[in-house]
């Protein structure tokens, strides 16, 4: 079987602790399914690298990782040492833009053994699988542009501007991906996040493109909500949603809120995709570097492991993806008595949980 080369970037904080468990599980499932994975480790995109070199990435970073089949990423950021906008714009956001990873995909599913903080209207707890949505976020333009600036800094006339950029190509390709995904799922339901009653130029354009794209997908039920009430609906009735698509900013907000509604953001995965595969796609947990718990060996590795499963799926190994998801669900099932990390009311270490999932795969 052809070798798949994976660029491994652990990054900062707990990224360095959860990444070994992600690789442990990837190696276990690769061994079971006869998949040839080569993991190449890189130390950049971290505070340690910045401290030594004065920049987040080497000048030839694209040459070093651009030929890989995928990037397996941990976390970046250490605000006490380096401002977030420096670490993010100097690494992760560069990966997304230079490698045209225009789809950010984040599933949010209520897993066994996890208590959702949002109950049903009658006060009863939600059951595993009752919340099962995917947030599709535009990942390369929108509100997160570098167009803008500061004038008259430090004076009473100080002005700060940052422009939102929406192109037809950029909007249409993320909407097409979202509609295709919705059409492939049982509910066939797509929700668009907007704010066209207040953001009177870019958001009406977004709405127009959604309406136009919907004509090509008559089997998909489409609705839209303004972002403020949409966040309320996420909390009140998360089971209503299936595929949710949003701009860079709105998708960013919703793709943290969605997993939070399922009980713990620590298990949430994400994929930054270049669907045409002209460049490597990047797979990372939703949680950040969490400096407050770094070094204590208590970080939950499931987000890293689940992101690895998404990577396997994108590389064409659907059965391996399913095996990893099944192992996660089995370990989280209360009857399994498996070791759990403190965020899930356990006292196990990061490696205890990673080993338990790897063992489950090997059964």
Regions found by a protein language model. Name each.
Residues 5-14, 72-77, 190-196, 306-313:
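Short glycine-rich or small-residue beta-strand-to-loop segments that form or flank ligand, phosphate
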Residues 7-24, 29-30, 155-228:
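Glycine-rich phosphate/diphosphate-binding loop of Rossmann-like nucleotide-binding domains
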Residues 12-15, 69, 136, 178, ...:
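Buried hydrophobic positions in well-ordered alpha/beta secondary-structure cores of metabolic enzymes
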Residues 34-58, 234:
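N-terminal beta-loop-helix "entrance" segment that forms/cooperates
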Residues 50, 234-336:
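Glycine-rich phosphate/nucleotide-binding loop
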Residues 140-141, 146-192, 196-200, 318, ...:
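Glycine-rich phosphate/pyrophosphate-binding loop and the adjoining helix
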